[in-house]
Amino acid sequence: MKKQKINGEIMEQMDFEADCNNPHNIISLIDKMDELLTQGQCLSIMEKQGCCKGGQRDKDCKAFALEHADKPLSEKIALMSSVQYMMSPYLNDDGTITVTFGDDQNGVHTGKNTCSCGSIKKLKQPFSISPTYCGCCAGHFLYHYQNALGVKLKLKEINSSPLNTNGEKPCKFTFEVLD
């Protein structure tokens, strides 16, 4: 959080010692972040998180990068859906990239979309969680898209989330291309 220039007085108000395997503790920390930090600071912190940065998906994205290194970004984005579990990203007119992860239902929510986060699956219905939490998942996609596309990305926005819509809206993130 020092990179985000968050002062010590604010940091002291956050509980970093709580058991991170308990989703309620994580949710409390996220709520405190939302209360004390700017949206930009929250996104900057959360995009550094993300699970599943290794394994087969990592190998597949790095192989995709080698295979398509000579192609322009727009073509790479159009081909990304060929990589398993990497969705179908969309290159917006302003040069940002939007990723939608939806129509997945595993029973976490009653709507047509659900959260695939292992911690969230431990919670009992009904619940509503700040979309800031989803920055962690966005960090997962940011990592893999950077590797696959060969560009530096920054999380610009968490557009929607099933976590605060009871599954009515999908996970949707927008990334800014930095180079």
Predicted regions and their residues:
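Active-site helix/loop of acyl-thioester processing domains in fatty-acid/polyketide metabolism
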Residues: 127, 131-150
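N-terminal accessory segment detector
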Residues: 1-129, 154, 164, 178-179
